Amino acid sequence: MESRLFNTPAKKAFGQHFLVDRYYIDRIIHAINPQPNDHIVEIGPGQGAITLPLLKCCGSLTAIELDRDLIAPLTAAATPIGKLDIIHRDVLTVDLSILAKQGNKKLRLVGNLPYNISSPILFHVLQQAAIIADMHFMLQKEVVDRMAAPPGSKVYGRLSVMLQAWCEVTTMFVVPPDAFQPPPKVNSAITRLVPRDPTTIRIADTKRFSDIVRAAFGQRRKTLRNSLADICTPAHFEHAGIRTNARAEQLEVTEFIALANAKNT
C-alpha cells in the first residue's frame, strides 16, 4: 500500500527516490527499533516516510536535508507529532560531533541515502564513528553487498575493509524498486552498521591503514608486493605475517590492520 504525505516531485539532481510502500516503511521502523529519547539523525528525510513514524516514537529528531523545497511541507507534517529540527545542508559538510554534544549522547543515524553519493557519505560518517551508536541505511543493493562482502568475494574491496574495520555490518533485507516513487532501476537493501568498541580496533595510524587499503585495491589484480611497493617494505610483510605474493581480496580485515601496524625493522 502506498503512503504519501505530500507530492513534491523527486529531483534527479539529488538522486531522489521516495519510499512510499507502507509495508517496507513498517519493516524499516521495526528494524531501527526507535526508543523514547533516542538521539536520531536522519540523512535525507525526503517526504517523511521514515521521519514521522520515528518522530512518534522518539518525540524529537534531527534531519539533514539539502532540497529546500522539502523543508516547509515536512516541517508542517511534523509539527503536530513532535520536535523536528531540519538542517538545510549537504551532509558531507555537517560535523556530527556537534549534534552529539548538543544531545549529550551518541547518535543513531538513519537514512535513505542518495545512490549517487552513498559512498562519500559512508566514509564521512565513518570518520565520526566514535560518537555514533548505530546506523541504519537504505542503499543500492550492490553497495550493501560490497559493504558486507567477505574476503575472496568478487565484490570485496576498499569499502568492505574500511567499514568492517570500524563497524559490524549486517544486511537486513531487500527493498524492491516498486516500493519507491519514482522507482529506481535496481534493488535497494537495508544495512545496519554498529561501530566497534574503539579499544578493540587497535589501528595505530588510521591514515596509513587507509592508504594501504586504497593502494591495495586500486590495483587489485597485482600482488601486494607490487601494489604496495611505495608503502610497505618486505620487513612490513614479514612482521605482519603476510605473503608478498598475496592479492588484496585474499586478506582479512585483521590482516590489513596488522600490515598497517607492522614495523619497518
Swiss-Prot record:
SMART domains xrefs: rADc
One Pfam family here: RrnaAD
InterPro entries listed in its UniProt record: KsgA/Erm, rRNA_Ade_diMease-like_C, rRNA_Ade_Mease_Trfase_CS, rRNA_Ade_methylase_Trfase_N, rRNA_adenine_dimethylase, SAM-dependent_MTases_sf
Protein location: Cytoplasm
Key words, A-Z: Cytoplasm, Methyltransferase, RNA-binding, rRNA processing, S-adenosyl-L-methionine, Transferase
GO cellular component: cytosol
NCBIfam families linked to this entry: ksgA (TIGR00755)
Family stated for the protein in its record: Belongs to the class I-like SAM-binding methyltransferase superfamily. rRNA adenine N(6)-methyltransferase family. RsmA subfamily.
Record's protein name: Ribosomal RNA small subunit methyltransferase A
